[in-house]
Amino acid sequence: MYIIIAGIGRVGYTLAKSLSEKGHDIVLIDIDKDICKKASAEIDALVINGDCTKIKTLEDAGIEDADMYIAVTGKEEVNLMSSLLAKSYGINKTIARISEIEYKDVFERLGVDVVVSPELIAANYIEKLIERPGILDLAIVGRGEAEILEFIIPEKAKVVNKKIKELGRPQDYLIIAIYDGDELKIPSGDTELKSGDRVLVLVKKDAADAIRKMFLEE
């Protein structure tokens, strides 16, 4: 995939490095010459020193051929303007970073496909872990309508030694994976839950607390 990333801060740098290592064609844009020089030496990407709100800069980056445009500079107005410019070239997907969550609806109404806030994501993640005692990790999916919970089944939990099909027909959750030691298994209805199993469950947001209790409480 051909991806243009505007802004070589912490988010842009990390994202570009990860995507380039996975074989994507990356173009980086930043207005700071020293930052561009450093990124050029460390990331397998075309690095352009320029203003991403200028048409010439975007065209130099090959905006006409890009599959995705990601604006993660530290300035929301720059991210919005450059994303809308990219959109005018018919690009398939634009992603823009914001810091103030109240701008999210505005960005989306104006045509930015995906609006993200690293600060808000981090805050939500910590809040969810606090709200879900016993959960090792979680991921918010489906535009916030669902979560993937990761937990270890306690020794005296009610589900220990039960087969998944014995838990009843799931309405609001799905067990998607179980770690038996270091081995990842995709479970079936006949899979037996054991004490110490590390389990990943996809669950509707509103049912997350009830499902957590079902698997963890004695």
UniProtKB/Swiss-Prot annotation:
Keyword Transport: yes
N-terminal signal peptide: none
Record domain RCK N-terminal: where: 1-116
Any one GO MF annotation of this record: potassium ion transmembrane transporter activity
InterPro entries, sorted: K_uptake_TrkA, NAD(P)-bd_dom_sf, RCK_C, RCK_C_sf, RCK_N, Trk_Ktr_HKT_K-transport
Coiled-coil regions listed: none
Residues in RCK C-terminal domain copies: 136-217
Alphabetically ordered keywords of this record: Ion transport, NAD, Potassium, Potassium transport, Transport
Subunit structure: Homotetramer. Dimer of dimers.
Domains: entry comment: The RCK N-terminal domain binds NAD and possibly other effectors. This is expected to cause a conformation change that regulates potassium transport.
Function per UniProt: Part of a potassium transport system.
Name of the featured protein: Trk system potassium uptake protein TrkA homolog
Species name: Methanocaldococcus jannaschii (strain ATCC 43067 / DSM 2661 / JAL-1 / JCM 10045 / NBRC 100440) (Methanococcus jannaschii)
Annotated gene: trkA
